[in-house]
Amino acid sequence: GGKKIVLVGNPNVGKSVFFNALTGLYVDVSNYPGTTLDMACGRYNGDVVIDTPGVYGVSSFSEEEGITRDIVLAADLVVNVIDAVHLERDLFLTLQVIDMGIPMVVALNMVDEAAREGLKINVDLLEKLLGVPVVSTAVVHNVGIEELKERIRFARPGQPDDQLLKKIE
Protein backbone atom coordinates (compact mmCIF):
# COMPACT_ATOMS: atom_id res chain seq x y z
CA GLY A 1 0.00 0.00 0.00
CA GLY A 2 1.71 3.15 -1.23
CA LYS A 3 0.88 6.54 0.17
CA LYS A 4 -0.47 9.51 -1.73
CA ILE A 5 2.02 12.34 -1.38
CA VAL A 6 0.66 15.66 -2.60
CA LEU A 7 2.79 18.71 -3.41
CA VAL A 8 1.14 22.03 -2.62
CA GLY A 9 2.38 25.60 -2.93
CA ASN A 10 1.88 29.09 -4.31
CA PRO A 11 2.65 29.69 -8.01
CA ASN A 12 6.37 29.81 -8.86
CA VAL A 13 7.77 28.35 -5.65
CA GLY A 14 9.60 25.53 -7.43
CA LYS A 15 7.06 22.76 -6.89
CA SER A 16 7.68 21.12 -10.24
CA VAL A 17 11.42 20.93 -9.52
CA PHE A 18 10.62 19.07 -6.29
CA PHE A 19 8.23 16.86 -8.15
CA ASN A 20 10.94 15.93 -10.65
CA ALA A 21 13.52 15.44 -7.90
CA LEU A 22 11.22 12.99 -6.12
CA THR A 23 9.77 11.14 -9.08
CA GLY A 24 12.60 11.12 -11.60
CA LEU A 25 11.73 10.73 -15.24
CA TYR A 26 8.48 8.84 -15.23
CA VAL A 27 5.70 11.33 -15.06
CA ASP A 28 2.16 10.88 -16.20
CA VAL A 29 0.46 14.17 -17.04
CA SER A 30 -3.29 14.08 -17.44
CA ASN A 31 -6.19 16.45 -16.90
CA TYR A 32 -7.98 16.69 -13.61
CA PRO A 33 -11.35 15.02 -14.15
CA GLY A 34 -13.73 17.45 -15.84
CA THR A 35 -11.18 20.23 -16.32
CA THR A 36 -8.37 21.34 -18.59
CA LEU A 37 -5.95 21.65 -15.67
CA ASP A 38 -2.85 19.48 -15.87
CA MET A 39 -2.23 17.00 -13.15
CA ALA A 40 1.16 15.34 -12.90
CA CYS A 41 1.53 12.01 -11.14
CA GLY A 42 4.72 10.11 -10.53
CA ARG A 43 6.14 7.46 -8.25
CA TYR A 44 8.57 7.71 -5.40
CA ASN A 45 9.59 4.56 -3.49
CA GLY A 46 6.27 2.87 -4.16
CA ASP A 47 4.29 5.96 -3.19
CA VAL A 48 2.32 8.09 -5.62
CA VAL A 49 3.35 11.74 -5.88
CA ILE A 50 0.82 14.25 -7.20
CA ASP A 51 1.60 17.82 -8.18
CA THR A 52 -1.19 20.40 -7.82
CA PRO A 53 -1.76 23.77 -9.53
CA GLY A 54 0.01 26.69 -7.84
CA VAL A 55 -2.55 28.39 -5.58
CA TYR A 56 -2.51 31.10 -2.92
CA GLY A 57 -5.21 29.42 -0.86
CA VAL A 58 -7.66 26.54 -0.84
CA SER A 59 -10.88 28.38 -0.10
CA SER A 60 -12.14 27.20 -3.51
CA PHE A 61 -12.75 30.64 -5.00
CA SER A 62 -11.28 29.35 -8.23
CA GLU A 63 -11.32 26.02 -10.00
CA GLU A 64 -7.62 25.53 -9.19
CA GLU A 65 -8.20 26.14 -5.49
CA GLY A 66 -11.19 23.82 -5.33
CA ILE A 67 -9.33 21.04 -7.09
CA THR A 68 -6.23 21.49 -4.98
CA ARG A 69 -8.38 21.29 -1.88
CA ASP A 70 -10.02 18.06 -3.02
CA ILE A 71 -6.64 16.51 -3.80
CA VAL A 72 -5.21 17.57 -0.44
CA LEU A 73 -8.20 16.10 1.39
CA ALA A 74 -7.50 12.74 -0.26
CA ALA A 75 -3.76 12.87 0.49
CA ASP A 76 -1.91 10.73 3.02
CA LEU A 77 0.64 13.44 3.38
CA VAL A 78 1.38 16.86 1.97
CA VAL A 79 4.68 18.46 1.05
CA ASN A 80 4.02 22.19 1.22
CA VAL A 81 6.67 24.09 -0.76
CA ILE A 82 7.04 27.67 0.41
CA ASP A 83 9.24 30.46 -0.87
CA ALA A 84 11.61 31.74 1.83
CA VAL A 85 11.62 35.19 0.22
CA HIS A 86 7.82 35.52 0.48
CA LEU A 87 7.36 33.62 3.69
CA GLU A 88 4.37 35.51 5.07
CA ARG A 89 2.44 35.36 1.81
CA ASP A 90 3.06 31.63 1.51
CA LEU A 91 2.22 30.76 5.12
CA PHE A 92 -1.39 31.73 4.45
CA LEU A 93 -1.74 28.56 2.35
CA THR A 94 0.34 26.54 4.83
CA LEU A 95 -2.08 27.41 7.63
CA GLN A 96 -5.09 26.54 5.47
CA VAL A 97 -3.59 23.12 4.74
CA ILE A 98 -2.76 22.62 8.43
CA ASP A 99 -6.42 23.35 9.19
CA MET A 100 -7.35 20.38 7.04
CA GLY A 101 -5.51 18.10 9.45
CA ILE A 102 -3.40 16.24 6.89
CA PRO A 103 0.11 15.17 7.96
CA MET A 104 2.59 17.49 6.30
CA VAL A 105 6.16 18.54 5.86
CA VAL A 106 7.16 22.06 4.82
CA ALA A 107 9.95 22.59 2.30
CA LEU A 108 11.28 26.09 2.82
CA ASN A 109 12.62 26.66 -0.67
CA MET A 110 14.85 29.37 -2.17
CA VAL A 111 16.75 29.86 1.09
CA ASP A 112 19.74 30.82 -1.06
CA GLU A 113 17.80 33.72 -2.59
CA ALA A 114 16.48 34.76 0.80
CA ALA A 115 20.04 34.81 2.16
CA ARG A 116 21.13 37.00 -0.76
CA GLU A 117 18.40 39.46 0.19
CA GLY A 118 19.63 39.40 3.78
CA LEU A 119 16.73 37.30 5.07
CA LYS A 120 17.68 34.71 7.65
CA ILE A 121 14.85 32.38 8.60
CA ASN A 122 14.89 30.55 11.90
CA VAL A 123 13.84 27.09 10.75
CA ASP A 124 13.63 25.63 14.26
CA LEU A 125 11.32 28.41 15.34
CA LEU A 126 9.17 28.01 12.22
CA GLU A 127 8.96 24.29 12.93
CA LYS A 128 7.82 25.02 16.50
CA LEU A 129 5.29 27.61 15.36
CA LEU A 130 3.75 25.33 12.73
CA GLY A 131 4.12 22.03 14.56
CA VAL A 132 5.38 20.22 11.45
CA PRO A 133 8.86 19.33 10.14
CA VAL A 134 10.45 22.15 8.11
CA VAL A 135 13.35 21.51 5.73
CA SER A 136 15.51 24.28 4.21
CA THR A 137 16.00 23.73 0.51
CA ALA A 138 17.44 25.38 -2.56
CA VAL A 139 16.12 22.82 -4.93
CA VAL A 140 17.57 24.23 -8.15
CA HIS A 141 20.99 23.59 -6.60
CA ASN A 142 19.87 20.21 -5.32
CA VAL A 143 20.21 21.41 -1.73
CA GLY A 144 17.93 19.83 0.86
CA ILE A 145 16.32 17.18 -1.34
CA GLU A 146 17.88 14.27 0.55
CA GLU A 147 16.89 15.77 3.88
CA LEU A 148 13.36 16.28 2.60
CA LYS A 149 13.14 12.62 1.55
CA GLU A 150 14.35 11.70 5.02
CA ARG A 151 11.84 13.92 6.82
CA ILE A 152 8.81 12.98 4.70
CA ARG A 153 8.48 9.97 6.99
CA PHE A 154 7.99 12.28 9.95
CA ALA A 155 5.15 14.27 8.39
CA ARG A 156 2.48 15.06 10.95
CA PRO A 157 -0.64 17.19 11.28
CA GLY A 158 0.31 20.73 12.27
CA GLN A 159 -0.52 22.58 15.45
CA PRO A 160 -0.02 26.25 14.64
CA ASP A 161 1.01 28.49 17.49
CA ASP A 162 -1.35 31.36 18.34
CA GLN A 163 1.42 33.94 18.01
CA LEU A 164 1.98 32.90 14.43
CA LEU A 165 -1.72 33.10 13.60
CA LYS A 166 -1.86 36.63 14.97
CA LYS A 167 1.17 37.67 12.91
CA ILE A 168 -0.21 36.31 9.66
CA GLU A 169 -3.77 37.62 9.99
Residue ranges of each PLM-predicted region?
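A short hydrophobic beta-strand->loop->alpha-helix junction that borders the nucleotide-binding pocket
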Residues: 8, 52-53, 83-84, 137-140
